[in-house]
Amino acid sequence: MLDIKWIRENPEALDAALAKRGAEPLAQNLVALDEKRRSAVQKAQDLLSRRNLASKEIGAALSQKNGELAEKLKVEVAELKAMLPAVEEEDRQLTAELNDALSRIPNIPFDDVPVGKDEHDNVVTRTVGEKPRWNHTPKEHFEIGEALGYMDFERAAKLSGSRFTVLTGPLARLERALGQFMIDLHTREHGYTEVSSPLMVRAEALFGTGNLPKFEEDLFKTTDGRYLIPTAEVTLTNLVREEILDQEKLPLRFTALTPSFRSEAGSAGRDTRGMLRQHQFWKCELVSITDAESAVAEHERMTACAEDVLKRLGLHFRTMTLCTGDMGFGSRKTYDLEVWLPGQNAFREISSCSVCGDFQARRMNARYRGKDDKSNRFVHTLNGSGTAVGRCLIAVLENYLNEDGSVTIPDVLLPYMGGLTKIERAA
């Protein structure tokens, strides 16, 4: 959430930033609403001040045996007391209206973020590795998985409907191996602390990360009002909600390997076959909590940690800097990692790493105490996928496919595969 004080002082900057994101100007309406709210606050404060002063004057009048004045003052105090509830209610309503409006405004992009409309305007930052060179024809992951006999969409649909998958045997083990490899890498070598956290959260947690109120249609909601997490970013980031941290203890780096749940409400007709876009999928999430000065460097570090997963798997990928029109709601700058999928003859997103500034921290009231002046400031938050397990499975299947239809296990996963070096067709 943006600071209304900053908006009051920089209305043109807000509208310019919104224009970069393809959004309409909002500063004038926000400033006008804030003026009404501040006026209501001042009115309530004036009434309280006058009531308190009149109450003291009653005592003075009585001590001077001026009963007539005391009675007049008592009448005034009663009138002021009667007026206060309406003024305070106006203040509450205007504050709620302003906060709701602020909660729906996206974050301000950094100056170095490329301006653009959509994914076609994203910029290639770097490319790692090369496309595999084969004599055989590439295949899509669902063709490979079904031919092996370990990937079943028909049974998944019978169980749960569309956008679900059943994996069995060595493919189920490969999925588990990928997740275990990622969490081991990030905790043992990248300095992240593993967290096991709930898969259901309250609305307040989703508000904190910016998923609510704007993106409720993307979420699964339980009958008791809780939500299934769309990503472990929600739980990991909210670990510091309503806390004041010591600057000396920053950065905090958290990671979790969890299922994620998404309704894919805006994805009708997209990636309907296979595992690319599922309602339920495993993901290894990375979250960093930093001070303001360290956030940009931490963003580069986090992205490098996610890239390391793909490098060790021997996968060809590129890192994209997202343009203003393609960035997430809470992001100030985002790198997407796109892995090469031979079966699609295309790069597809496998990780997204974002720096959010104090945007989420304001929503969570998460702060740190400065080590020099001891003043309290909002933390800066970052999040990234390290990486999406299902999409990594897809990439391994398509990039390690052999001519006979078998799939070679990448070397880095061999310790997790119980002696299996290749996945072959089920007998």
From Swiss-Prot:
Keywords: Aminoacyl-tRNA synthetase, ATP-binding, Cytoplasm, Ligase, Nucleotide-binding, Protein biosynthesis
Recorded name of the encoding gene: serS
Subunit structure: Homodimer. The tRNA molecule binds across the dimer.
InterPro entries: aa-tRNA-synt_IIb, aa-tRNA-synth_II, aa-tRNA-synth_II/BPL/LPL, Ser-tRNA-ligase_type_1, Ser-tRNA-synth_1_N, SerRS_1_N_sf, SerRS_core, tRNA-bd_arm
Enzyme Commission designation: 6.1.1.11
Residues reported in the UniProt entry to bind L-serine: T231, A232, E233, E285, S385
NCBIfam families according to UniProt: serS
Origin superkingdom: Bacteria
Gene3D superfamilies membership: Bira Bifunctional Protein, Domain 2 (3.30.930.10), Serine-tRNA synthetase, tRNA binding domain (1.10.287.40)
Chief location of this protein within or outside the cell: cytoplasm
Any coiled-coil regions, as ranges: none
Species assigned in the record: Rhizobium leguminosarum bv. trifolii (strain WSM2304)
Name of the protein in question: Serine--tRNA ligase
Record-level Gene Ontology MF annotations: ATP binding; serine-tRNA ligase activity
Record carries keyword Acetylation: no
Reactions catalysed: tRNA(Ser) + L-serine + ATP = L-seryl-tRNA(Ser) + AMP + diphosphate + H(+); tRNA(Sec) + L-serine + ATP = L-seryl-tRNA(Sec) + AMP + diphosphate + H(+)
